[in-house]
Design a protein with these regions (language model features):
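Aromatic-rich peripheral "rim/lid" segments of glycoside hydrolase catalytic domains that contact
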Residues: 15-32, 36-109
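Active-site environment of divalent metal-dependent phosphoester hydrolases
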Residues: 11-13
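Active-site neighborhood of phospho(di)ester-bond hydrolases with catalytic His/Asp-centered motifs
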Residues: 4-7
């Protein structure tokens, strides 16, 4: 019975909504959660993967609260736009995610 750790997230540094803000605290948190999932999977536990919250991709939030015509981010319309989103420009976070993807792909080979 495999389990997936899902919908964990962490705001951008300083609770900023800007896509140019740093993500150092988020990166540390993701590394921690990924280590728990990866260590459990590597030791034969039930975790098979994880899903972070949430993918903002190429969105460019124009307002703190979503308005008609704004890009959709990983944050739902009723929440602050960009706060928990991982954008395509968040290189350090994407590097953390890639490291976890590579680790999980190698577990069980």
């Amino acid at each position: 019975m495999p389990l997936v750790m899902e919908e964990f997230g962490y705001p951008r540094d300083g609770f900023s909504f800007s896509t140019s803000s740093t993500t150092e605290a988020r990166d540390r948190y993701y590394k921690y959660v990924f280590s728990l999932v990866g260590d459990n999977a590597a030791s034969g536990g039930y975790f098979a993967g994880c899903n972070f919250w949430g993918w903002g991709g190429f969105a460019n939030p124009k307002h703190e609260q979503w308005q008609v015509g704004d890009d959709y981010t990983g944050d739902p319309a009723q929440e602050a736009q960009g706060l928990n989103s991982v954008f395509s420009t968040d290189k350090s976070t994407l590097d953390v995610v890639k490291t976890q993807v590579d680790r999980m792909k190698n577990i069980g080979k």
